[in-house]
Amino acid sequence: MILDKIVEATKIRVAQEKQVESPEAVKAAALALPSDTGFPFEAALRQQDFNFICEVKKASPSKGIIAEHFPYLDIAKEYEVAGAAAISVLTEPDFFKGDKKYLQEIASTVKIPVLRKDFIIDEYQIYQAKVWGASAILLICACLDVPTLIKFRKLADSLGLSSLVEAHDEAEVQMAIDCGARIIGVNN
């Protein structure tokens, strides 16, 4: 299954990233930043009856490279001008060709909230999201058990990050509810 391959690759990537920048350093950097307890990502989704989270994505496992020339900043600016409530930015490099620089540069350019879209399996990635300028993170039920979902959601809350909890079926929607998710995304 592709999700299993992505999670395994993510474990390797996170271990390598921890060798470059220690978990203690990333945590300290995240904790040194102000926490916006107003949760701007959630507030943005409440602005109107219909709100859009628009995605900046270079590739996917099913489609391959979507855009060889990838003007991610221009795309993000166009989304903002078009009225997007928030922008989802892929940071997973192996299967989606994402990059932390996409998130960092978009977050520092647009005025709307930005979600780190990745396969979050380690607290380290949540601290990274905060440091990189995200307003929210994606937590995928299929990758995590309920205790871990709760732990990660609470950590994100403490940093002022919203959690969009993704479910693929009815059982995962129940998992999202059980973990106290305030935002649930259904992907099937």
Regions inferred by a protein language model and the residue ranges of each:
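Alpha-helix-loop-beta-strand connector modules within alpha/beta enzyme cores
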Residues: D36-Q48, F96-F119, C141, T148-E166
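Active-site-proximal loop/turn and secondary-structure-junction residues that shape catalytic pockets
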Residues: K58-S60, P93-F95, I120-I121, Q125, ...
